[in-house]
Amino acid sequence: MNRDTIFSTPIEKLGDFTFDESVADVFPDMIQRSIPGYSNIITAIGMLAERFVTEGSNVYDLGCSRGASILAIRRNAPTKNFRIIGVDNSRPMVERCRSHLSAYHSDIPVNIVCDDIRNIEIQNASMVVLNFTLQFLPRTDRIALLTKIYHGLNPNGILILSEKFSFVDNTIDELLVDLHHTFKRANGYSELEVSQKRTALENVMLTDSIQTHKNRLQDAGFSQIELWFQCFNFGSMVAIKQSP
């Protein structure tokens, strides 16, 4: 696993964070050292796949990066007769995802698409994963995507939405941000790395509160919604499409 040193030296002109070649190269290390509980979320996605993936359906991983969720789904699904569609708009991520998945034999068909997730039609879906992806879309585009997902899910289908959260109470928000930075330092990131990455992300990663996410999911059509995991200001929610 290549170690993330992207922000380890001072960068004179610090642009917005992008999922470019350098990020794709170190992404597994970056995400493990940056997102508390990431491994737990991936493990649970596999557990949810075991319960929700159905025969003959489609499973979508929107913002699939290097394919960690897809591997968990493939390993745990109760049937091999379904299809996985992984989507990412980063060409370097897509190339590495395809290469990574090809190292593990499976009879389950997987199609990795390089495209904007907003362009993807969701059909016959038993499961949709949005793992730390929605936060990179403009807020005005989020409800349309979630509504499309809701309509594309089969009855009893599940959406897994993992995000970094913000909090209305400033004291709580600052505490959880500080704990997250402590977590990153404990994982070997320097103050410079933490600071520069935060600056690079501030215009492209737009976080919402847990209640805002719940309200938006309700507006999209979901009625069964719950936060199932949280560590500091990161977490994951499930939303299930009820049977008629």
Swiss-Prot record:
GO molecular function term, any single one: S-adenosyl-L-methionine binding
Binding-site residues, S-adenosyl-L-methionine: 38, 63-65, 88-89, 116-117, 131, 198
Signal sequence region: none
Keyword tRNA-binding assigned: no
EC number(s) per entry: 2.1.3.-
InterPro entries, A to Z: CmoA, Methyltransf_25, SAM-dependent_MTases_sf
Gene Ontology BP annotations: tRNA wobble uridine modification
Pfam families: Methyltransf_25
Reactions catalysed, as given in the entry: prephenate + S-adenosyl-L-methionine = carboxy-S-adenosyl-L-methionine + 3-phenylpyruvate + H2O
Task of the protein: Catalyzes the conversion of S-adenosyl-L-methionine (SAM) to carboxy-S-adenosyl-L-methionine (Cx-SAM).
Record family assignment: Belongs to the class I-like SAM-binding methyltransferase superfamily. Cx-SAM synthase family.
Matching HAMAP family: Cx_SAM_synthase
Subunit and partners: Homodimer.
Record-given protein name: Carboxy-S-adenosyl-L-methionine synthase
Gene that specifies this protein: cmoA
